[in-house]
Regions:
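Catalytic cores of alpha/beta
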Residues: 1-9, 62-73, 100-103, 107, ...
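Glycine-rich anion/phosphate-binding loops
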Residues: 1-9, 29-38
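Glycine-rich phosphate-binding active-site loops on the catalytic face of alpha/beta enzymes
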Residues: 12-27, 76-91, 115-122, 127-152
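Generic secondary-structure microfeatures
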Residues: 22, 57-61
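Active-site glycine- and acidic-residue-rich loops that bind
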Residues: 28-31, 60-64
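Short, contiguous strand/loop micro-motifs
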Residues: 29, 57-58, 85, 108-110
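Alpha-helix-loop-beta-strand connector modules within alpha/beta enzyme cores
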Residues: 32-54, 72, 76-77, 92-119
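A contiguous pocket-lining binding segment that forms or flanks enzyme active sites
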Residues: 52-58, 67, 81-83
Length: 152
C-alpha cells in the first residue's frame, strides 16, 4: 500500500515514469504469489494515468532461476521496463543478467541496465546484450573516455 500511495503522489507531482523496487524478500523466499499480486495491483493504476513503469529486481542478488521467474511474472503483467539494479546492492548490472532478461522477457518489455556502469566498453557490451536504456552516474566519463569517479 505504501508503494501505491507513493506512486500516486509521484504521478500527481507530474512523474511520467515510475521506478518500483520489487519485494526482494518475497523473491528470495519464492513467494511468487506476493510478487504477482503486488504488480497486478499496481499496473491498473499506472495504466489508467498513461504512465510508464520500471520494475527493479536487484539482479545481482538473485539466482538465474529467480531472474527468469521475475521475467515471466513482470512480462505477463505488462511492465514497460525491467531494471537490473537500484545501485545499492553490491553487484549492479551484468551482461549475463541482461542476456537473461532479453531471452525471457516479451519483446515489448525494454531492459534498463543500471548499477556499476563505469566505462564505454561495459556500457556498449550491455547495449549489445540487449539493454535498451542505461542508468549511469558516470555518463560524462563514459562518452568522453575519461576515468570515472565515485563508486556508483
Amino acid at each position: 500500500e505504501a508503494k501505491i500511495a507513493e506512486m500516486i503522489l509521484a504521478m500527481v507531482d507530474g512523474a511520467d515514469e515510475l521506478d518500483v523496487v520489487a519485494n526482494i524478500t518475497a523473491i528470495k523466499n519464492g513467494d511468487w504469489m506476493a510478487i504477482a499480486d503486488e504488480i497486478n495491483h499496481i499496473m491498473p493504476i499506472v495504466r489508467s494515468k498513461g504512465k510508464k513503469i520500471k520494475v527493479i529486481i536487484e539482479s545481482g542478488v538473485l539466482t538465474n532461476e529467480e531472474i527468469i521467474k521475475c521475467c515471466d511474472i513482470y512480462g505477463i503483467a505488462g511492465i514497460d521496463y525491467l531494471k537490473t539494479s537500484t545501485g545499492y546492492a553490491e553487484k549492479g548490472a551484468t551482461i549475463e543478467a541482461v542476456q537473461l532478461f532479453k531471452k525471457h522477457l516479451p519483446s515489448n518489455v525494454q531492459i534498463k541496465a543500471s548499477g556499476g556502469i563505469r566505462d564505454y566498453a561495459f556500457a556498449n557490451a550491455l547495449l549489445a546484450a540487449g539493454a535498451t536504456r542505461l542508468g549511469c552516474s558516470a555518463s560524462v566519463a563514459i562518452v568522453t573516455g575519461a576515468p570515472a569517479t565515485g563508486n556508483y
